Amino acid sequence: LHKEYRRQRQMCIRDRPYGDRSKEEIISLTRDSVNFLLSKDVKIIIFGCNTATAVAMSTIQKEVPLQIIGVVQSGALAAARATETKNVAVIGTKATVNSHSYLKEIQYRDPEIQVSEFAQPKLAPLAEEDPAEEIKQAVVSESLAPLRNIDYDTLVLGCTHYPLLRDEIVAVVGQDKKIVDPADQVAQYTYNVLRRDGLFAADDSDTTHEYYTTGEAKKFTEITRQWMNDETIVGHHVNAED
């Protein structure tokens, strides 16, 4: 989204990791972030977190007047289109995997697709800590070991952190596997919604992008600059519960 639609003003809030939290906690924390964004007068909200999408989106959507776009639905659509053998593997947080959201969404589109889900509690912290390359590769190799025992041609990166480990993941699963990053489909769907509803900003409008985090602003800035390939990004600390 940042790359494709720089002329559209964007606000991003990054909260603490949700993957190991209870359903009630995830919904409450997600609600706080959504209310913060609503206070900024946004026109559409995107859940860039698979866990929040899987666990909280259906509840929060009933509470807000704006459309919410989630990554799970987009990732499931991309996976269903990509697989040729009808065998898909999904890696994600415990909460995402336990919700079986990808299983339901993929099989809703094609009931014949076999979906294997694997919780990966070590990968999101690994992406945030960004240790030495040999440590990253060792942790990824150990975490993805169960995938060696199944047949699949498509792998869904079911956590927004995982694209930061894409090279390490490909080194384990092999170049022959199709890697689905839901972000690509989300960007296209968001474009369609903005165009359909006449929400695109004019070319001469304010395009200042704002980035917030409930965590450490310095670390958030470093990670986001790396991820977005944009050295101009500056993160600001905020308490979304205020």
Language model features: what each stretch is:
Residues 1-13:
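Single conserved hydrophobic/aromatic residue that forms the stacking wall/gate
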Residues 10, 14-31, 125-131:
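N-terminal beta-loop-helix "entrance" segment that forms/cooperates
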Residues 22-36, 135-143:
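Glycine-rich, highly charged phosphate/nucleotide-binding loops
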Residues 37-95:
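Glycine/small-residue-rich loop that forms an oxyanion/phosphate-binding "nest" at active or ligand-binding sites
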Residues 69-124, 185-186:
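Conserved beta-alpha
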Residues 76-79, 120-128, 177-198:
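Short, flexible loop segments at boundaries between secondary-structure elements
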Residues 105-173:
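Active-site rim beta-loop-alpha module in soluble metabolic enzymes
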Residues 204-242:
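ATP/nucleoside-binding phosphotransfer catalytic cores, i.e., glycine-rich phosphate-binding loops
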